[in-house]
Amino acid sequence: MAYPYKKMTSEDFDYIRSVTASDRVWVGDEIAKEYYRDEMPEYGVFPPELYAEVLNKEEISAIMAYAYKENIPVVCRGAGTGLAGGATCKYGGIMLSVMRMNKIFPIDRKNQTITAEPGALLIDIQAAAAAGGLFYPPDPGEKTASIGGNVITNAGGMKAVRYGLTRDFVRCIEAVMPDGSIMNFSSNVVKNTTGYDVKDLVIGSEGTLCILTQVTLKLLPAPTCTCTLVMPFRSLEECADMVPKVLELPFVPTAIEFLERELIDIVERNLNKMFPVKQGEAVLIVMYDASSKQELDSAVEAAAEAALANGALDCCIAGTPERAGAVWSVRGGILEGMKADSVAQEECDVVVPRARIAEYVKAAKKIASAHGIRVEPCGHCGDGNIHTEMLRGPEMSDQEWKEATHASLVELYALSKELGGQLSGEHGIGNGRLEFLEEFAGPRMIALYKAIKLAFDDKLILNPGKVIEYNK
């Protein structure tokens, strides 16, 4: 049975209005249905009892202190672009939107950092850094995601192969705890071995441990030269086999992505975004950044020679911003294109060792096809994060789709584990992957997860039923 959370009353609604403002609070049927779910309604549609837009940490603190006292569950929501059913009110209660907390503070040039509130958009932080001649590298596909959401999911993206994940760029965090207290995790320093590294525990915790109110991010000098290569191959298998060849070169790529021609056709057909390379049944897209043209030219030459020596039909250099933009626009349009081309979608977001990518891709296509599902693997092959996109055709009934996707997921996750991989590389556990987590983690690790949750949130009020589930 569910944990006995309090059903909210008019007195509770009035209190939340008193510490925020009446025009920033909605209750019951007043709440827009878009706040019942994230980008994957398949992972749960749950109406909040109250939706509030907060402006500062003091409002969050007051609400959390009250919710803690009254035993009311609270979920924090950013831009709602998650893909795991994470920012949803599974047990009702309060949904707090931090999207009005979107201030980006001036760059700290001496420390090469930038500080922002959680509702600031990733695209705006990247623009602010660029305006100062600096660079914020984490680059997940959804540029309109909030930075708070990026931090609590440890977002990665296409440039992780060279620059790492969001975690690698977080210097310090300010957050409100479940009891309403306000804490700082670390400070704007490069090194810190002062006690347990709680900051890195908070990063990637999916909003289950605390609510971010401010984050300070490391910046890098902006690269002065960049180039995108497109390597077409006769088959997806040949394309995947090329990945370790690229990684063996003495130049670290900024991004390595693969796309099948069928997926490119979906984007072209539905979004009218044209891919500039027409050859090949699959393509490998490789990007390099460099601080000098000489360094960049050396990297491009080495990659092109390796591609042609390993079966590529060509190695096309997207030498202008327009051609490079066309390549990455198609890559960025995959999710939107698939939504337009199918009745429904399901995704397996596994990560496998880079040396096993080709093996995973070959087996994944067979698994999904055996269950009658159209499947389109793609992803960040530079870090082994493969998005296995499953698309529902109009001929499948709801029950057939549900059974086929579940059976496919069971086998795909088992395949990932067999290859030494993990359940999720980017999107997290949320509500959508709960049933598969214990198989990966094991009972001892699940017990550790629960102990960590209780250490932060002893009343289990913050985003309950995500990552781990006490209410079974």
Could you say what each language-model-derived stretch is?
Residues 1-65, 82-112, 263-273, 320-347, ...:
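N-terminal flexible segment immediately upstream of the FAD-binding catalytic core
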Residues 27-37, 221, 227, 232-411, ...:
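C-terminal substrate-recognition/cap domain of FAD-linked oxidoreductases
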Residues 181, 434-472:
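Activity-critical C-terminal alpha-helical subdomain
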Residues 22, 417-429, 454, 458-462:
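Alpha-helix capping/hinge segments and adjacent helical runs
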Residues 103-257, 462:
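FAD-binding subdomain of flavoenzyme oxidoreductases
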